[in-house]
Regions:
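Terminal low-complexity/charged segments
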Residues: 1-166
Length: 166
């Protein structure tokens, strides 16, 4: 029998983060929370899509969190649903957190956080362009890589290219 696994050194940070989100945003703000051991024990939280923008403002402005730096934003097509993944970083204590927002695949829509972290602007446009995830409230949601007349979103798993050479 394997010995019990020791808790992650980041578990207290995750617990505090979840408590802050639930206290400040609401009990329904957090859909799931776990330590991603494969990613250097990164505290990871799945945030309710309807609460995401409010949560983003809190994450940036809360004096304990100070997540001022958006390290990355990417979209993922899981076939059953779409997900937007955000890696946020506290520049003072060098702590990284991961946040995920799930959305329906057929009407993929997530609130924009370009007003919270300006770096999200182009990343949201890229996720729109390639995966078709619409970011509501984005100041300029249009294609960023593909021509304006491109049909579809080529990184979706159900994408069928019009031209077989593509």
């Amino acid at each position: 029998e394997a010995p019990p696994k020791e808790p992650s050194p980041n578990q207290p940070k995750l617990d505090r983060l979840v408590a802050i989100l639930k206290e400040q945003i609401g009990g329904d703000a957090v859909e799931d929370a776990y330590i991603n051991e494969m990613d250097r024990h990164t505290p990871t939280v799945v945030v309710n899509r309807e609460r995401w923008h409010d949560a983003a403002v809190l994450l940036r402005d809360h004096p304990e969190l100070k997540l001022h730096y958006l390290r990355s934003l990417s979209g993922v097509d899981y076939e059953t649903h779409m997900e937007v993944v955000y890696h946020l970083f506290n520049l003072q204590n060098k702590q990284t957190y991961c946040f995920k927002v799930r959305t329906d695949r057929e009407q993929a829509e997530v609130p924009s956080v370009a007003d919270v972290w300006p770096a999200a602007n182009w990343n949201e446009r890229e996720a729109w362009d390639l995966l078709g995830i619409r970011f509501t409230g984005h100041p300029n949601l249009k294609r960023i890589m593909l021509p304006d007349d491109w049909v579809g979103h080529p990184l979706r798993k159900d994408y069928v290219p019009v031209d077989p050479e593509v």
